[in-house]
């Protein structure tokens, strides 16, 4: 019988299987992902408030008419839980909903990981780079669950962090910068 932790880990790892990345992964990589997800779920150190900040469509990839029609102020909110590991890296589980490019609600949930650096000794300033693995749903895709694996970067001070990702794409599709504030408490 599956526990809810196994189900949670399977849902978060679903995008890896659907994109074929799981088949290229070295042995143990998915176990590490699963263990990190379960540990973050069972042993959170913090709870997080997510506030979407900006959606920016790459100007080289869209006509001005399209850009003018898109929403680039994705108001919404989210909640999550997170922890810092023994290396100082960040792990988080999150659910967020925001207004997408078409001003329709887009929920997203998943797991994020960032290697984190503190370049100024004794300072609360930090920056990071990593990835997020999750599932989103969009109005223009009839709210069918869509797996995502995206790069992530951040810069922060103390409990406030600006996290961001870039959704790659083609002309008139994708090529979107998305950023949100994460307040850790």
Curated annotation (Swiss-Prot):
Single GO MF annotation: acyltransferase activity
Domain of life: Bacteria
Secretion signal, residue range per the UniProt entry: 1-24
Keywords: Acyltransferase, Cell outer membrane, Membrane, Signal, Transferase
Principal localisation: membrane
GO biological process: lipid A biosynthetic process
GO CC, any one term: cell outer membrane
Subunit structure, interactors included: Homodimer.
Similarity field: Belongs to the lipid A palmitoyltransferase family.
The protein's role, per its UniProt record: Transfers a fatty acid residue from the sn-1 position of a phospholipid to the N-linked hydroxyfatty acid chain on the proximal unit of lipid A or its precursors.
Protein name, entry field: Lipid A acyltransferase PagP
Gene name per UniProt: pagP
């Amino acid at each position: 019988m599956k526990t809810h932790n196994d189900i949670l880990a399977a849902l978060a790892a679903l995008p890896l299987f659907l994109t074929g990345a799981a088949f290229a992964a070295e042995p143990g990589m998915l176990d590490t992902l699963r263990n990190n997800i379960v540990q973050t779920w069972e042993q959170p150190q913090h709870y997080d408030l997510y506030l979407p900040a900006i959606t920016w469509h790459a100007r080289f990839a869209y006509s001005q008419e399209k850009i003018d029609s898109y929403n680039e102020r994705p108001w919404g909110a989210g909640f999550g839980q997170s922890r810092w590991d023994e290396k100082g890296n960040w792990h988080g589980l999150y659910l967020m909903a925001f207004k997408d490019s078409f001003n329709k609600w887009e929920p997203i949930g998943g797991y994020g990981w960032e290697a984190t650096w503190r370049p100024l000794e004794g300072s609360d300033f930090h920056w990071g780079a990593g990835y997020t693995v999750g599932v989103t749903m969009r109005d223009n895709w009839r709210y069918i669950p869509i797996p995502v694996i995206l790069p992530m970067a951040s810069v922060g001070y103390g409990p406030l962090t600006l996290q961001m990702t870039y959704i790659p794409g083609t002309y008139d599709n994708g090529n979107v910068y998305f950023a949100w504030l994460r307040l850790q408490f």
